[in-house]
A protein has these predicted regions:
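Alpha-helical oligomerization segments
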Residues: 195-196, 213
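Short alpha-helical "recognition helix" segments of helix-turn-helix
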Residues: 184, 190-194, 201
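Short, Lys/Arg-enriched C-terminal cap helix and immediately downstream tail that follows
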Residues: 207-219
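Short helix-to-turn junction characteristic of helix-turn-helix DNA-binding domains
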Residues: 173-180
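Residues within the DNA-recognition helix of helix-turn-helix
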Residues: 197, 204, 208
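DNA-contacting interfaces and partner/effector-binding or oligomerization modules
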Residues: 1-124
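Linker/hinge segments immediately adjacent to helix-turn-helix/homeobox DNA-binding domains
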Residues: 91-165
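Short alpha-helical "packing" element that flanks the helix-turn-helix/winged-helix DNA-binding module
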Residues: 166-173
């Protein structure tokens, strides 16, 4: 089973409708979408995680929005909220979800909102992922492939970005004590564990570390 990380770049940095409305509330930052369900009537049930802003102001914006059919909020700590919304269908969003359905692919939450767009992880059969990406070229929303890798349910997203060989290198380095202080293993030790040269072990580990750090800092 494979997974791919995609970055969606909607116009103006938000999808039309409730996403755009939340983005426009002063002080509010959309951190991510924890759950997204495409319901039988065509509407969406979504659970946003947001930070900042005022709970009353957020509620007023959602109540006044024509496309919001239902909404609710729950506090997640200081200036943190989970926002549930049931919203009317958007053609651009449904077009993307339809592609996932047609190719029997999984949308692996959460969907992470960053300054550069919406980061999404999709998982499924490798051939189906390739076929689906060919279809998304016809969708209005610009989409970029950020990374590809294996898929293990419940695994941190940062590890999903690694190739099998990079994962092996990182696991070997960790188990051998490469990250201990003082360091208990060398590239020679890692190379021996992987049946490769020290220089190859170094390269695999460097690339794995770069992908993990990029995932943690860039979303």
């Amino acid at each position: 089973m494979k997974s791919v990380g995609l970055r969606l770049r909607p116009a103006e940095g938000a999808f039309p409708g409730v996403d755009e409305a939340l983005a426009g509330i002063p002080g509010v930052t959309r951190e991510g979408i924890q759950h997204l369900e495409w319901l039988a009537d065509g509407t969406y049930a979504m659970l946003y995680r947001v930070s900042g802003g005022d709970e009353v102001a957020i509620g007023e914006v959602l109540t006044a929005h024509d496309e919001v059919l239902q909404h609710d909020m729950v506090s997640a700590g200081a200036d943190q909220y989970y926002v549930f919304v049931n919203v009317a269908e958007q053609e651009s969003v449904s077009a993307l979800l339809q592609i996932l359905d047609e190719h029997r692919l999984l949308l692996d939450p959460p969907l992470r909102v960053t300054d550069d767009g919406l980061c999404v992880t999709v998982a499924g059969d490798g051939d189906a992922l390739q076929a689906a990406f060919a279809d998304v070229t016809d969708v209005e929303v610009p989409i970029e492939v950020e990374w590809t890798g294996g898929y293990r349910p419940g695994e941190p997203a940062a590890l999903s970005r690694l190739t099998d060989r990079q994962r092996e290198a990182l696991e070997a380095a960790h188990s051998l004590g490469f990250y201990e202080t003082p360091r208990e293993a060398s590239f020679e030790d890692i190379g021996e564990a992987l049946s490769c040269s020290p220089s190859t072990a170094n390269e695999l580990l460097r690339r794995a570390e770069a992908r993990v750090v990029s995932s943690l800092l860039d979303g």
